[in-house]
Amino acid sequence: MEMSGLSFSEMEGCRNLLGLLDNDEIMALCDTVTNRLVQPQDRQDAVHAILAYSQSAEELLRRRKVHREVIFKYLATQGIVIPPATEKHNLIQHAKDYWQKQPQLKLKETPEPVTKTEDIHLFQQQVKEDKKAEKVDFRRLGEEFCHWFFGLLNSQNPFLGPPQDEWGPQHFWHDVKLRFYYNTSEQNVMDYHGAEIVSLRLLSLVKEEFLFLSPNLDSHGLKCASSPHGLVMVGVAGTVHRGNTCLGIFEQIFGLIRCPFVENTWKIKFINLKIMGESSLAPGTLPKPSVKFEQSDLEAFYNVITVCGTNEVRHNVKQASDSGTGDQV
């Protein structure tokens, strides 16, 4: 492909993105890119020609036949959570930035439909190439987890096309707990227990209520901590959307425990989710999503979770909520 102006990571990324187009779209795009000078024998030939004759990744993505929705879905498959109303030129920039940041990484392939239970992908932390590094980078773990969790959950929204993977109880420990606090026209707190119930309640947010949760993964929106017992806590804040409307903000705490039977795999032990509708905030203000608790709050929360029983955990959550710390989610 000596004619192509694409880097290796751009080449692989565009190849995966083109996998979201059907055969007719691929053939039509090939005609456009090559000015009908190439007559491909099959889909593989057409993709090869498209990549070879594209002068740059941006030129290819700007083609009218590469629709905005296709780029959006591709980014979702890579765990990159973008608000649904994002314009095409901004989506292109997100894709270019993603490819530029990881030239040495093997990009995720666009997923095939899941048909068997054993094919379901659990959250796995990417293993560093440096095998000597025994310490877990919890900040990186938190970022990877959020990309995976929100990308998978948001992809279940029927307005965004086919899901990128199968959502279900397999991602949670069987005794997982969800505390869901939401403040819209009135305040409500609900508790859910068990992997099946928790996974269904979270699924209903995007599949039935059509919400889109967009996490803020900068230093203010994401905080992580760990305990000697192996529990990892991830605190994240972000905005809540439905279509082109921003409805409010959210704060969420996850408790993760490594699965001892599958290498580098973590499952969710508990979730505290707080959603605040715009109507519950000061008029005309929508603050930048940020986690309002500190590292010490997470570590203190740990000690209760890992040592005490369910009743004491709930008591700790209530105390934190009353005191105004970040554990109020």
Curated annotation (Swiss-Prot):
GO biological process: apoptotic process; positive regulation of apoptotic process
GO cellular component labels: nucleus
InterPro entries cross-referenced by the UniProt entry: NTF2-like_dom_sf (IPR032710), UPF_C3orf38 (IPR026698)
Keyword line: Acetylation, Apoptosis
Pfam families documented for this protein: DUF4518
Signal sequence, renumbered to the chain: none
Keyword NADP: no
Cross-referenced SUPFAM superfamilies: NTF2-like
Function: May be involved in apoptosis regulation.
Name of the protein in its database record: Uncharacterized protein C3orf38
Organism name: Homo sapiens (Human)
